[in-house]
Amino acid sequence: MDTLNCMKALISLLGVILAMAFMASPAHAQSHENDRYQKLADDLKAPGLAVVTFDATGVTDEHYVGVDSNSNPIGPDSLFIWGSISKSFTSALAMMLAEQGKIDLNAPLTRYYPEFQGTALGNNGATVTDLIHHTAGLPRELNPYPHNLQSVIDGVKDLPSVDPVGTHSYSNISYILLQQLIERAAGESYSTLLETYLDPATGVTPLSRADTINSTVPAGHAPFFTGNLAVREPIQDYEIGEGNLAGTGRQLADYGAWQLRQHQAGQLPSTLPKVSTTDDYEYGAGLFYEQFDGTQLVYHGGAVPGFNSYMGFNQQTGKGVVVLYNVMGFRDQMNNNGIVTPALVFAEETLGVTPKQQSSNTHWGDVIVYTQTALIVLALLTIGRVIYTWVRRTPPARSTRRRVITIGAALVLGIGSVLTLVFGPVALLGFTLPMLYITAPDLMLQCWILAAEIAVLTGLIVIRQLAWRRHTIRQASMTYESP
């Protein structure tokens, strides 16, 4: 009897151990899974991250990491700006309006923009579809950067030349014009048209009015030395359809599920003919189509000040993923070779393909920060040396001509360097100073500190030369007067 009881006890104990192991396994797996998303957030240096997977029926899984700029935990209701994924909404809306007979996709742009008659764009024969495909010949941005819709139209009118029609060249300006064209043709605002046509089809109602987005979406972040700085770029209504729709990760995943269903069924917007961009890429209705060893991914990414985004799906597996995170700056883009971020690599692996490129190991944005830090320290040491030699050194005997040359060289080099540091980034990148502060606050702060140091150094050199000249004259006068 004792032996039987012992065996029963051992069997019971074994059952408990097995049950505990079984129950613990999912928790361990869940912990490992959470570590994966935390690592992605760390690699992105993102304060907040949302990853939502989907299939043709909707959301299948979701993970959230970190906080927004108000220190609220990222979750299902957290709002992000979706960036250039917005272009696929605008393209789909244009195609729906074309079905309703409100827009002719094959019409020349001059039908909807008579002010372009006789301009470089008006003369090249670009159509509405060319705006969708980025084949209208327009540049990516205008330089200087426009402040409102009229400045965009005026900037396009003033372009001395444009590329030939048919050559794909990604252009944000094309989609600003496409949104305005839609509004002109339909006689209603972009937001109202989305709510009337696209939202009922997709089941998704993104934030599409500038005042609502500006007041409800928490600020994003830009890299700032070893951390991040909360930044906000005020959005205007004319640029919503180009890259500023906003919403949650779930909403974007539901939209992705609609796009997946439409593609699988061969329905709008997948029916728009595609244009080749490179050997492995095509572009359709606001989406890229890329081949990975026989597997095609359909996707678009987005990057606006403070926010990064990705939405894509694999038609063959029926799986899709959305990645949203609340940091983006010019330094990020330099660090990641433009668009090859850890998020892109993560998304492609999630969709079952081997990424063609990995994130860059050489972070050029960080290199610039370190270089400018070294220059700031060097300039400060030089200022200290100039002051020290001025106070402790006997004024050297130099000719007036040599002093004039020294002063002139200091002024030319100093003023030139200051102007280059203050206005060079604006001229080079075509951004305004406020926009550069939003997208690259640490780099711009360093430029201004370095410019101030050079201005002080230039002033010290000039004043020191004048003081030494005065000392030399006084010494000469005393020598002349002495018996």
Segment roles from a protein language model:
Residues S31-W82, K102, G118-T119, I153:
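Short, conserved catalytic-motif segment at the N-terminal edge
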Residues L44-P47, S71-D130, S161-I173, G384, ...:
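Short active-site loop at a secondary-structure junction
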Residues H32, R36-K39, S84, F89, ...:
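Extracytoplasmic/secreted proteins, especially bacterial periplasmic and envelope-associated proteins
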Residues D2-L14:
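Bacterial N-terminal signal peptides that target proteins for export
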Residues V65-V67, A120-N308:
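Short, surface-exposed loop or secondary-structure junction motifs
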Residues A19-H28:
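C-terminal segment of classical bacterial N-terminal signal peptides
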Residues S31-D55, P234-P483:
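Catalytic loop of the DD-peptidase/beta-lactamase superfamily, centered on the K-T-G motif
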